[in-house]
């Protein structure tokens, strides 16, 4: 009986007929989340949060634990897939004006910040060379905060340098934060269904809706199956495509890698950080690169919701996507010309999108009135 009620609930859930494939990434994110929690749980059974044993425990999982190589690779590749889906999900929200559902957008941005924190803590856990140095560089940014910076850094490290207490608390945080993500995801979905999802036209779709099941459930299942297939193919043939070669060596505090860089999904924020020569300025720009998303619902001035009918904003949006990719690329390069200049120009363009959003909206309204 409860099973029938759940099916009936999905069957009665009205959804716009014209929502495209870009709306499937929410369910894909939910799948990624479930997969990460399951693989993470099994990996935590074999992991040892100790600076002398952490690296060896990962090697033990991959070599000795039955199907451990699959769990470890699923967890690592799953994180990359998670962020690919997240960035597409955010881009869809920006393009189609989903941010006008303010509560859903603000909870989603908070989710993104929590996800990035969780991924950062997880990257430190293998205690490889790049894990150690990336953690040192990023956590050291806290010292840029006036008055409180040094105290906060010492508190986070659990001492005067990154050591055993740091790894222990990072493991604890990496384990507990996903449960916070699940809770906030539930709130995110509830807030979304209070108003209902938007559609590519940005219009009210009350007059033309279909049941969620079977139409959108099968569509979701197809996209989820495709995503899992891509992940399994990656794990089978190119499992180390996203790994840094430096991270296959155990952490050595006495040897600094030639280029310190985090995982690829943080490179755009890291590129913005590096483009500013001042430490405090760089730390603020790093924080702003994500938190600026919180301003979008409050700077929308256009009469139309979606960018489907807004050619100027379409140009701005695709410029944003291009700058995102260029910043990611420059962050992998050494801090020298021409990369520093490219990084500074693209970082300026990145923030320009959010600052010019209200002006472009106002201009479009003026043009529309003139045409009428």
UniProtKB/Swiss-Prot annotation:
It is a multi-pass membrane protein. Heme b b562 binds at residues 75, 174. GO terms for biological process: mitochondrial electron transport, ubiquinol to cytochrome c. Its main location: mitochondrion. InterPro entries: Cyt_b/b6_C, Cyt_b/b6_C_sf, Cyt_b/b6_N, Cytb/b6-like_sf, Cytochrome_b, Cytochrome_b_C_euk/bac, Cytochrome_b_N_euk/bac, Di-haem_cyt_TM. The keyword Glycoprotein does not apply. A ubiquinone binds at residue 193. Its cofactor is heme b. Pfam families: Cytochrom_B_C (PF00032), Cytochrome_B (PF00033). CDD domains: cytochrome_b_C, Cytochrome_b_N. Binds 2 heme b groups non-covalently. Keywords: Electron transport, Heme, Iron, Membrane, Metal-binding, Mitochondrion, Mitochondrion inner membrane, Respiratory chain, Transmembrane, Transmembrane helix, Transport, Ubiquinone. One of its GO terms (molecular function) is ubiquinol-cytochrome-c reductase activity. Heme b b566 binds at residues 89, 188. It comes from the Eukaryota. The keyword Protein transport does not apply. The chain crosses the membrane at residues 25-45, 69-90, 105-125, 170-190, 218-238, 280-300, 312-332, 339-358. One of its GO terms (cellular component) is respiratory chain complex III. The cytochrome bc1 complex contains 3 respiratory subunits (MT-CYB, CYC1 and UQCRFS1), 2 core proteins (UQCRC1 and UQCRC2) and probably 6 low-molecular weight proteins. Belongs to the cytochrome b family. Component of the ubiquinol-cytochrome c reductase complex (complex III or cytochrome b-c1 complex) that is part of the mitochondrial respiratory chain. The b-c1 complex mediates electron transfer from ubiquinol to cytochrome c. Contributes to the generation of a proton gradient across the mitochondrial membrane that is then used for ATP synthesis. Heme 1 (or BL or b562) is low-potential and absorbs at about 562 nm, and heme 2 (or BH or b566) is high-potential and absorbs at about 566 nm. This is Cytochrome b. It comes from Acrantophis dumerili (Dumeril's ground boa).
């Amino acid at each position: 009986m409860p099973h029938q009620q759940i099916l009936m609930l999905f069957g009665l859930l009205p959804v716009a007929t014209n929502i495209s494939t870009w709306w499937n990434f929410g369910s894909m994110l939910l799948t990624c989340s479930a997969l990460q929690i399951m693989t993470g749980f099994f990996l935590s059974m074999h992991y040892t949060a100790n600076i002398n044993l952490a690296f060896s425990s990962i090697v033990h999982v991959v070599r000795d634990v039955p199907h451990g190589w699959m769990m470890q690779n699923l967890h690592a590749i799953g994180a990359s897939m998670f962020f690919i889906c997240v960035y597409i999900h955010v881009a869809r929200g920006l393009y189609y004006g989903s941010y006008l559902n303010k509560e859903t957008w603000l909870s989603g941005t908070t989710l993104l910040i929590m996800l990035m924190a969780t991924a950062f803590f997880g990257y430190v856990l293998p205690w490889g060379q790049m894990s150690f140095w990336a953690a040192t560089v990023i956590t050291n940014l806290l010292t840029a905060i006036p008055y409180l910076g040094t105290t906060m850094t010492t508190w986070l490290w659990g001492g005067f340098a990154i050591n055993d207490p740091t790894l222990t608390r990072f493991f604890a945080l990496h384990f507990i934060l996903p449960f916070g993500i699940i809770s906030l995801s539930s709130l995110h979905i509830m807030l979304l269904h209070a108003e209902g999802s938007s559609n590519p036209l940005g219009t009210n779709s009350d007059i033309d809706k279909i049941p969620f099941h079977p139409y959108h459930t099968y569509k979701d299942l197809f996209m989820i199956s495709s995503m899992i297939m891509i992940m399994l193919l990656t794990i089978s043939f190119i499992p180390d495509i996203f790994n840094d070669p430096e991270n296959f060596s155990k952490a050595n505090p006495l040897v600094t890698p030639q280029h310190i860089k985090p995982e690829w999904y943080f490179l755009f924020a890291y590129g913005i950080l590096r483009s500013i020569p001042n430490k405090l300025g760089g730390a603020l720009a790093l924080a702003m690169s994500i938190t600026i998303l919180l301003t979008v619902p409050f700077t929308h001035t256009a009469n139309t919701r979606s960018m489907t009918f807004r050619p100027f904003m379409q140009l701005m949006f695709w410029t944003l996507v291009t700058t995102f990719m260029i910043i990611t690329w420059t962050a992998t390069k050494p801090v020298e010309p021409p990369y520093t200049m490219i990084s500074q120009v693209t970082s300026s363009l990145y923030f320009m999108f959010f600052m010019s959003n209200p002006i472009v909206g106002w201009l479009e309204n003026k043009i529309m009135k003139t045409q009428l």
